């Protein structure tokens, strides 16, 4: 599995999009500068952690002065490649896949689902929210032609490994997998897992 760019530890890499989102909100509110202690309250992350996270990227602020919002937006935008459009494919147009396509990252200008794939003949050939739905066996031709390297897999666990193999054969190098099954993939393939059931069970552990 690939490591994040800029030699960022995985925990830090997961927090960078959070920082970026909040700096964008600060910019919208007309705030030009913020200190780490103030930012810590907004993002619910300790200020010491924020300063340590930022140190992995560079000297982003000055002691006693804080962080310039516009400068941090530029830095995080470059790290996240926020100025580059990333086209994605969705594999599996069930309830979850359909919801993702309907939303299609409407709050992010640089993320866009441009095609979807399913095994259901009744869905193949249809268009959902402007996104065409293809048959799974069309992966090998559609993905390379569209220049897509990122896919979101919403297929059931029993189909996730086979789906991943087909995606990789088609040129996909990054996969967001909603099935809990750990995929066996080459080292250069980047896989992230999002198990909604596990997240909810973890949440309930803290319920009084």
From Swiss-Prot:
Keywords: Cytoplasm, DNA-binding, NAD, Repressor, Transcription, Transcription regulation
GO biological-process terms attached to the record: negative regulation of DNA-templated transcription; response to redox state
DNA-binding region(s), chain positions: 18-57
Origin: domain of life: Bacteria
Keyword rRNA-binding belongs to the record: no
A GO term for molecular function: DNA-binding transcription factor activity
Keyword Repressor included in the entry's annotation: yes
A cellular-component GO term for this protein: cytoplasm
Main location: cytoplasm
Bilayer-spanning residue ranges: none
Signal peptide positions (record): none
Subcellular location: Cytoplasm
Binding positions (NAD(+)): 92-97
Family affiliation: Belongs to the transcriptional regulatory Rex family.
Role noted for this protein: Modulates transcription in response to changes in cellular NADH/NAD(+) redox state.
Quaternary structure note: Homodimer.
Stated name of the protein: Redox-sensing transcriptional repressor Rex
Organism ancestry: Bacteria, Bacillati, Bacillota, Bacilli, Lactobacillales
């Amino acid at each position: 599995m690939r490591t994040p760019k800029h030699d960022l530890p995985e925990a830090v890499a997961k927090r960078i999009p959070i920082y970026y989102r909040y700096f964008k909100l600060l910019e919208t509110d007309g705030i030009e500068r913020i200190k780490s202690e103030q930012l810590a309250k907004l993002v619910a992350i300790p200020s010491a952690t924020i300063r340590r996270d930022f140190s992995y990227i560079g000297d982003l602020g000055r002691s006693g002065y804080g962080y310039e919002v516009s400068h941090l937006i530029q830095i995080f935008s470059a790290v996240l490649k926020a100025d580059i459009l990333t086209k994605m494919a969705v594999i599996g147009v069930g309830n979850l896949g359909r919801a993702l396509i309907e939303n299609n990252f409407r709050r992010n200008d640089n993320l866009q689902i441009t095609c979807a794939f399913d095994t259901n003949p009744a869905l193949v050939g249809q268009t959902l929210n402007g996104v065409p739905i293809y048959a799974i066996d069309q992966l090998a031709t559609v993905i390379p032609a569209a220049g897509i390297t990122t896919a979101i897999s919403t297929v059931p666990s029993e189909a996730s490994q086979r789906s991943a193999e087909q995606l990789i054969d088609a040129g996909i190098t990054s996969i967001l997998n909603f099935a809990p099954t750990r995929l066996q993939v080459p080292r250069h393939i980047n896989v992230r897992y999002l198990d909604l059931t596990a997240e909810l069970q973890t949440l309930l552990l803290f319920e009084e």
